């Protein structure tokens, strides 16, 4: 007789996205069992100002490891994502302790799948420090 499937634990998560359009950050609250999204909550969008967009554009197509200013841009980007998280928390009336995890991939600045190369900027550890929430 097959074992009954173990009930999955529900988690509240915040997902972050900053796409190649470089218009800004989208952040959304969701409920998940780790495999499926079972509910949605507050969502916010934070626009980038033109100066920051230009800084990101300056990294496109380059390996950020070879760019002296990439670290400062990555830190700025990460702090902007932390602000988006704080806005979602404010909109939802939740606190950091109520969130199980933040999904964060940074911002892709180099993507050549044919060569097996992709590079993102962003600092998950800094985001976790800034928000008090684990980051994956």
Please state what every model-predicted region is:
Residues 1-136:
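Short acidic/glycine-rich loops and adjacent helix/strand connectors
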